[in-house]
UniProtKB/Swiss-Prot annotation:
Signal peptide: none annotated. It comes from the Archaea. Residues 7-197 form the AMMECR1 domain. It holds the Pfam family AMMECR1. It comes from Methanococcus aeolicus (strain ATCC BAA-1280 / DSM 17508 / OCM 812 / Nankai-3). This is Protein Maeo_0138.
């Protein structure tokens, strides 16, 4: 899948910030000059962190490439700021103390596994984001999450189950579907400051 250039990644982060600012101010934000890649369907997540402590402040996204990237980014950035049920809505003035991180996702692919041990072999911490499905339960963790928490593969899978509202050993004891994806990450180092691509 075609990756974003660094300039396109910067555009995504800046767009997300302005989009949130406009939404919180009651202003409709429209972009006229759009890089072509933003018209292609992509999955995307917007993650907000407090600055400088870098505590999670909101994270919502659209994992599947079901709409043009610009539309997914518009929806995810607003949702991360006001619709994450774990946090109160972000205030307009508070946004000055928040950094924005954008993850552009590859389409999720089913991890083929004949036994739970196969997951330990096929999933790579730091490369793979994961989605687990079991019945009506579904949970997702971005690839940067286990790195931030220093999890090994077993801890990663256990926490993936917890994210879905399942017991930690569901991936071992039940017939689940686990999907993997990769992400290209662009983030601010400080609020409205320098933007970098995370390698």
């Amino acid at each position: 899948m075609e990756k974003l250039s660094f300039e396109e990644g910067k555009f995504a982060v800046k767009f997300a910030r302005i989009n949130i600012e406009c939404y919180l101010s009651g202003v409709h934000y429209v972009v006229d000059d759009l890089p072509p890649i933003f018209k292609k369907p992509r999955g995307v997540f917007t993650t907000l962190y407090t600055y400088p402590k870098r505590n999670l402040r909101g994270c919502i996204g659209i994992p599947e490439p079901v709409m043009p990237l610009i539309d997914a980014l518009k929806e995810a950035s607003i949702s991360a700021s006001v619709d994450d049920p774990r946090f109160p809505p972000v205030g307009r003035m508070e946004l000055r103390d928040i950094t924005i991180e954008i993850s552009i996702l590859t389409p999720p692919k089913l991890v083929e596994a004949n036994s739970p041990a196969d997951y330990l072999e096929k999933i790579k911490v730091g490369r793979d984001g994961l989605i687990i499905e079991y019945g009506t339960y579904r949970g997702l963790l971005l690839p940067q999450v286990p790195i931030e928490h220093n999890w090994d593969i077993g801890e990663y899978l256990a926490n993936l189950c917890l994210k879905a509202g399942l017991p930690v050993d569901t991936w071992i004891k039940k017939k689940v579907n686990i999907y993997s994806f990769e992400s290209q990450i662009f983030k601010e180092l400080s609020p409205n400051g320098k933007i970098v691509e995370e390698k």
